[in-house]
């Protein structure tokens, strides 16, 4: 084996190790797992998610324009409807005999304690008209 091939093999091994260690921190949930003591569940999770999305939106350049605030109320109603739809889907998935992927907002923030970055992954993308 030549020196460059050996170096490439070592570099590839280090890269794989780094990828594995960074992806190893994902939350996973077993069916029937109990909530984390610092986790947020149910209406508390929905309210926390909504608040964190508003914070993220303002950090990304949201404004306090009154016209946009009126539009925000309907966006919040849509978010609440979306969360209700997700809850209904989660209940259907719990009844399913097939195992589901153990990652989602409930897994990350109720069954585990989530970070700001983790909960804002579930926020809708910020567009120019949503600030």
From Swiss-Prot:
Keyword S-adenosyl-L-methionine belongs to the record: no
Tissue: Expressed by the venom gland.
Localization per Swiss-Prot or TrEMBL: Secreted
Residues bearing the modification 4-carboxyglutamate: 118
Signal peptide extent: 1-24
Function: This venom insulin facilitates prey capture by rapidly inducing hypoglycemic shock. Intraperitoneal injection of this peptide into zebrafish lowers blood glucose with the same potency than human insulin. In vivo, when applied to water, this peptide reduces overall locomotor activity of zebrafish larvae, observed as a significant decrease in the percentage of time spent swimming and movement frequency.
Assigned protein family: Belongs to the insulin family.
Protein name: Con-Ins Q1b
Organism the protein comes from: Conus quercinus (Oak cone)
């Amino acid at each position: 084996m030549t020196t460059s091939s050996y170096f490439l093999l070592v570099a590839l091994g280090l890269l794989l190790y780094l990828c594995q260690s960074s992806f190893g921190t994902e939350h996973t949930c077993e069916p029937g797992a109990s909530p984390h003591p610092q986790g947020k569940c149910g209406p508390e999770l929905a309210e926390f998610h909504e608040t964190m999305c508003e914070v993220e939106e303002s950090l990304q350049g949201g404004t306090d324009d009154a016209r946009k605030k009126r539009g925000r109320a309907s966006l919040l109603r849509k978010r609440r409807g979306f969360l209700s739809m997700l809850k209904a889907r989660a209940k259907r998935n719990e009844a399913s005999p097939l195992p589901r992927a153990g990652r989602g907002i409930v897994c990350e923030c109720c069954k585990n304690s989530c970070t700001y970055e983790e909960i804002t992954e579930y926020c809708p993308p910020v567009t120019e008209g949503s600030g």
